[in-house]
Amino acid sequence: MASLIYRQLLANSYAVDLSDEIQSVGSEKNQRVTVNPGPFAQTVYAPVNWGPGEVNDSTVVQPVLDGPYQPASFDLPVGNWMLLAPTGPGVVVEGTDNSGRWLSVILIEPGVTSETRTYTMFGSSKQVLVSNASDTKWKFVEMMKTAIDGDYAEWGTLLSDTKLYGMMKYGKRLFIYEGETPNATTKRYIVTNYASVEVRPYSDFYIISRSQESACTEYINNGLPPIQNTRNVVPVAIVSRSIKPREVQANEDIVVSKTSLWKEMQYNRDIIIRFKFDNSIIKSGGLGYKWAEISFKAANYQYNYMRDGEDVTAHTTCSVNGVNDFSFNGGSLPTDFAISRYEVIKENSYVYVDYWDDSQAFRNMVYVRSLAANLNDVMCSGGHYSFALPAGQWPVMKGGAVTLHTAGVTLSTQFTDYVSLNSLRFRFRLAAEEPSFTITRTRVSKLYGIPAANPNGGREYYEVAGRFSLISLVPSNDDYQTPIMNSVTVRQYLERHLNELREEFNNLSQEIAVSQLIDLAMLPLDMFSMFSGIESTVNAAKSMATNVMRKFKSSKLASSVSMLRDSLSDGASSIARSTSIRSIGSTASAWANISERTQDAVNEVATISSQVSQISGKLRLKEITTQTEGMNFDDVSGAVLKAKIDRSIQVDQNALPDVITEASEKFIRNRAYRVIDGDEAFEAGTDGRFFAYKVETLEEMPFNIEKFADLVTNSPVISAIIDFKTLKNLNDNYGITREQAFNLLRSNPKVLRGFIDQNNPIIKNRIEQLIMQCRL
C-alpha cells in the first residue's frame, strides 16, 4: 500500500551529522608517511622514551602579612589581627567602644624600677606607676577603665622579647595577647558596643587574617621574618588598603573614529571556544577484515556561554590541514586485518577553528584591521576504537595526544543551512605529547600524534579560553547592516521556493479524483515509483533518496517510532492495570512514546476525553508497527502526496526532502482509530471524541476506557477511514449489511472502491474531507 513509502523511509533512514553538509573548509594537504619498522620490529622500536620536558608549577602562594601601615585611626576589620611593631616605649594602641571599655596599651622598656610616668591616653594626661623587672624583655601593660571619667587600672601584661603586640575584633569580643614569650596566648574581653569599636595605633602595624592566627602567634612569640626587618620595607598609609580597584570592562566597544556614514569600532572580547573533531570510517567490502579509510572531517558545534552576564550563542567549525597518511597491512589473505589509509595529525599539521557568536562584534565584520588574539593552549588526547572483526580478537587503536598552540587568527566565513557567517579563524600548530598511539595485536606501536579513529577521546568537546581584539569599519547607523549579512544562501532560496510549493500543493487538493486516490492508496509505492514523476530523478536517484532519508530522519514520526521500538517490549510487560481511570495514562504510555508520559498530577484531574485524546495521538505509531490488511491514513496521505507530486510544477529533487518530511507530520491532522473485539467496536479520535458501538446494529454503548486501553495494547489498531459518524449516516440512509459494516470498519479498500464506483455521496464526501486535510 501507499504507506509503504513511510515504512521504507523509517527502515532505511540514517543519522547524518552536521559535518556532512559542510564542504571542504580551506585547502587540504596530505603527506604520505611510510613507517619502516626495521630491525627493531620485534622490540617495539628503539629504546627511546620521549617525555613532555619541564612542567611548570602553577601553585599560588598567598602572603600572610599585609603591611606595614603607618599609624592612623581606623575601623579594624572584623576577623583580622592587628599586629603592632612599636620601636620605643610609650602608648602603643588605644581602643574603645565609647560606652563600657577604654583600653590603652603602654610599652615599658626592660630594667625599669618602680616609677611614675605621664602618658597621654584618649587625649588626657594620666600619671601611671610602672615597672619592668625583666632585664631582657619588653613589657606591654593593658590599662583599662570602664567609665569615661573613671580611673585606669592594670588588666593584663605581656612580656615580650620580640616587641610585638596583637589585637583583633571577632564574635562581639576584643582579643589581645597576654603572658610571656615564647608562650604568649590570646585573651578576650566582652565589648558592650561591639559595632562602634575604634582602634588608634601609635606604631607601624600589619594586618593578618584570623585564618592565619597560628602565624600571628608565631610572630608574637618568635618575631617577624627577616625580610620585614630591612630598610627596603616602607610603611604606607592605611587608606591605601581602602582604595577600590577600578573595574576594567573586559568586553567593550570603543569608537575609534567616526564620520557621517562610517565609523571605526574597536571590539574587545573574552571568548570561550568549544570545538570537536569529526571523522569518517569506511569499511572495505569482502569478509569484513579490511578498512578502506579513516579520515578527519569538518565538524560544526553550537553552544551557549555567559560573558559579563550576557548569554552568548556561539558557533564553531573545526577542520584540520596537513594530515599524515598511515597504513597497515597485516597480510595478503582475505582474513588478514588491514587499513588502507588512516589519517594522523601531528607536529606538521594544523587545526583550524572558525568561531562566530551573536555579539555586536560579528554583526558587520567585513572591513577589519588590527586583528589580534591571545588564547590558552589545549591538550587533545585520543580514545579507543575497536575494529570489529568477524572472528578472532579485535585490534584496538588507542592513545595519542597533541597540544594545540595558537599560531594566528584571520577572517573566514562559515556556511550553514540558513546563513553565511563572517567569523574568525583561529589557527593552531600542534606539538606531539605523551602517550603515543598504538594498534593492539599489531606491530604498530609508539607512534605520536592523534589518529582519526577517535580524536575526541569520548569528550563532547574541547574548550579554549582567550581574548581577541579588532577594529572594524561599520556603518554609523547601528540599525544598518553591510550587504554581506543580507546575502542569500542556498537554504534561504529553498525556503522561498518551499513557500511557493506549499501554496501550489494546497491548491492541487481539489484536482485529485477520489477514485484515483483509492487506486494510488492500494499501490505499494516505493521510493522510486513515488518520485518517478520528477525530472532528473532517474539520473540522480541515489543522491535524491539519500537526501530524502537524511531529512526524514529528523521528522517527529521517525524519532517517535525510533523510541517506540526501543521501549515497546519492556513497556508492554510492565503495564499496571487498575480499576481507576487514572491508570490509563500509564497503560497507554507503556507502548507509546515513553518520554512523553503524562504526569500523575495531570492524570488525576484528566477527563475521559482528554485521556482518549492522549492515547489516540499515539495510535499511529501502534498501527505502523502492526500492519493490517486494511487501508490506513498513511496510505491516503501517501497517495495524495504522489498525486500532487505528479501534478506539481514547483517540486524538484532539492525540495523533495522537505516536502516528504512535512507531509508525514501535517497530512490528515484529525485522525480516528478503532479496535474491534468481537461484535464491539471502540473508536477514538485525536480531537478527544470517542464512541463504542455494536457492529451489527451500530447502536452506541457506554465507552469502557479501561477495556479500550487493554485492547489498544494487545490488539491491532485500524485507521477509521470511514468514521462512526459517517458509518451511521450511511446505514441510516442506505442501509448496509453486517459484512459490509465489518469491511468498512476494517477499511477494506475494495469495498471502499465499490462504494465510490457506485458514486455513493456519503463515502465520497468523507474521502474528499481527508484529501482536503492533506495540506502543507
Swiss-Prot record:
Hydrophobic as annotated region, ranges: 389-409
KID motif, short sequence motif: residues: 644-646
Biological processes annotated in GO: permeabilization of host organelle membrane involved in viral entry into host cell; virion attachment to host cell
Coiled-coil regions listed in the entry: 491-518
Marked site (Cleavage) residue numbers: R231, N232, R241, S242
InterPro entries, sorted: ConA-like_dom_sf, Rota_A_VP4, Rota_VP4_MID, Rota_VP4_MID_sf, VP4_concanavalin-like, VP4_helical
Renumbered ranges of motif DGE motif: 308-310
Region (Spike body and stalk (antigen domain)): 248-479
Region (Spike head): 65-224
Residue numbers marked as site, Probable cleavage: R246, E247
Keywords (A to Z) from UniProt: Capsid protein, Coiled coil, Disulfide bond, Hemagglutinin, Host cell membrane, Host cytoplasm, Host cytoskeleton, Host endoplasmic reticulum, Host membrane, Host-virus interaction, Membrane, Outer capsid protein, Viral attachment to host cell, Viral penetration into host cytoplasm, Viral penetration via permeabilization of host membrane, Virion, Virus entry into host cell
Disulfide bond residue pairs: C318-C380
Miscellaneous information on this protein: This strain probably does not use sialic acid to attach to the host cell. In group A rotaviruses, VP4 defines the P serotype.
Family: Belongs to the rotavirus VP4 family.
Listed name of the protein: Outer capsid protein VP4
Organism this protein belongs to: Rotavirus A (strain RVA/Cow/United States/WC3/1981/G6P7[5])
